[in-house]
Amino acid sequence: MKNPSLRQKLEAYYRLTRLDKPIGILLLLWPTLWGIWLASPGWPDGLVLFVFIAGTVLMRSAGCVMNDLADRNFDGHVERTRQRPLVTGDVTTKEAVLLALALSLVAFILVLQLNPLVVALSFPALFLAASYPLTKRFLSIPQAYLGIAFGFGIPMAFAAITGQLPLEAWILLLANVFWAIAYDTEYAMVDRNDDLNIGIRSSAIFFGRLDVFAVMACYGAFLILMAWVGVRLQQSWPYFAGLGVAALVALYHYALIRDRDRQSCFKAFLHNNWLGAAIFVGVLASDYFRSSILSI
């Protein structure tokens, strides 16, 4: 872009950080909120909530910039990504690097308000976010790595609330890995032909004709692990009701993706926001129900 105005430049940064597409923030935020509430004996501390919500927005935005930096030589060959700011020249490589660094720095300053264990965990969290885009070059299922990166707020949440990393935090993280493989395979089914042409790896390519089966199997593993967490943490019936609603949402996704229509697969991917929300409502309701019983 030649001599862009301030408004045009800010709009380009807005698109680069995907703030115009909040689904990524929500898919990152829901597991973090599950972790915060499941780790808390009651309503979580306000500072912890603020740091994690703001940090989620900042690091998801930074991750999008890092992703586009890594993929800038590929995105022009993919129909869905050829208008990204780094491809069109609306944002320079130097500007993108500085933006990613600035966002990460602000997120780190927020983390410094919490305990030393959370601060220590922020370093592998940053590494996961920065390295994920490169895994599409050599991992057959980079979506599994994405699940770890997107779910790392879970052990950080337990560390912030309890000062420890109990087994439940890691089970919840593993559950999130299966969920991420499920929803990001739906996403990858949209780009499969383009990814094959440019040599990018994805779970949709790896699973091939078994892609739909793999997605549903991952949903199943995710829900089983979430139920295990609920049993271990002695959650009340609304938690498991939330899992039941999530299972119905997953079945709806099967109806969307079984014919492998690109638009329907993308719709299923976006719809995972409601699956995450259903579980969070179940977590909140379970906490309220248990508090009501204890107060009697």
Curated annotation (Swiss-Prot):
Query: GO molecular function of the protein, one example?
Result: 4-hydroxybenzoate polyprenyltransferase activity
Which residues fall in a coiled-coil region? none
Q: Which GO terms describe its biological process?
A: ubiquinone biosynthetic process
Record-linked InterPro entries: HB_polyprenyltransferase-like (IPR006370), Prenyltransferase (IPR039653), UbiA_prenyltransferase (IPR000537), UbiA_prenylTrfase_CS (IPR030470), UbiA_sf (IPR044878)
EC numbers, comma separated = 2.5.1.39
Q: Give the subcellular location.
A: Cell inner membrane
Reactions the enzyme catalyzes: all-trans-octaprenyl diphosphate + 4-hydroxybenzoate = 4-hydroxy-3-(all-trans-octaprenyl)benzoate + diphosphate
Q: Which residues cross the membrane?
A: 23-43, 46-66, 99-119, 141-161, 163-183, 211-231, 237-257, 265-285
Classify the protein's membrane topology as the record does: Multi-pass membrane protein
Q: Name one GO cellular component term.
A: plasma membrane
Named cofactor requirement(s)? Mg(2+)
Q: Which Gene3D superfamilies match?
A: UbiA prenyltransferase
Query: Membrane: present as a keyword of the record?
Result: yes
Heme found in the keyword field: no
What pathway is it annotated to? Cofactor biosynthesis; ubiquinone biosynthesis
Family annotation (PROSITE patterns): UBIA (PS00943)
Keywords linked to the UniProt accession = Cell inner membrane, Cell membrane, Magnesium, Membrane, Transferase, Transmembrane, Transmembrane helix, Ubiquinone biosynthesis
Query: Which enzyme class, named as a word?
Result: transferase
Function according to Swiss-Prot or TrEMBL: Catalyzes the prenylation of para-hydroxybenzoate (PHB) with an all-trans polyprenyl group. Mediates the second step in the final reaction sequence of ubiquinone-8 (UQ-8) biosynthesis, which is the condensation of the polyisoprenoid side chain with PHB, generating the first membrane-bound Q intermediate 3-octaprenyl-4-hydroxybenzoate.
Similarity comment: family membership:
Belongs to the UbiA prenyltransferase family.
Q: What is this protein called?
A: 4-hydroxybenzoate octaprenyltransferase
The organism is: Methylobacillus flagellatus (strain ATCC 51484 / DSM 6875 / VKM B-1610 / KT)
- Taxonomy of the source species: Bacteria, Pseudomonadati, Pseudomonadota, Betaproteobacteria, Nitrosomonadales
